């Protein structure tokens, strides 16, 4: 089995400009348990299943925070993105440096949409 560690902020945290410390606290939590994730998923809570998409700048800044942490701790894992992933936004998401895949929620319920998303991810 593979473990996937999911982190992300709620809307109040995003709006309060406390996102970095919030994400770092989540990342530190798994280090305290001496657990190294096989995959790490950045999934802003406010974007899960809501249809509200995170803009690419928000995703980029979060991936940068995560990458800096992983490098500092010498943890080698892939970063995924989840949170209202759709046919409409998949190209933009996978073009963000550091994103190596996606967790697809609601869009995976439609086989045709999911196939389109999967084909864009795998190239």
Region locations from a protein language model:
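Active-site loop-to-helix "anion-binding N-cap" substructures in soluble metabolic enzymes
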Residues: 1-123
């Amino acid at each position: 089995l593979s473990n996937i560690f999911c982190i992300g902020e709620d809307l109040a945290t995003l709006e309060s400009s406390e996102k970095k410390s919030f994400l770092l606290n989540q990342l530190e939590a798994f280090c305290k348990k001496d657990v190294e994730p096989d995959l790490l998923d950045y999934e802003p809570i406010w974007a899960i299943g809501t249809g509200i998409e995170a803009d690419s700048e928000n995703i980029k800044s979060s991936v940068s925070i995560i990458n800096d942490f992983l490098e500092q701790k010498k943890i080698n894992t892939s970063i995924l993105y989840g949170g209202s992933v759709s046919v409409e936004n998949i190209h933009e998401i996978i073009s963000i440096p550091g994103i190596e895949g996606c967790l697809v929620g609601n869009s995976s319920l439609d086989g045709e949409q999911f196939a389109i998303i999967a084909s864009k991810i795998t190239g």
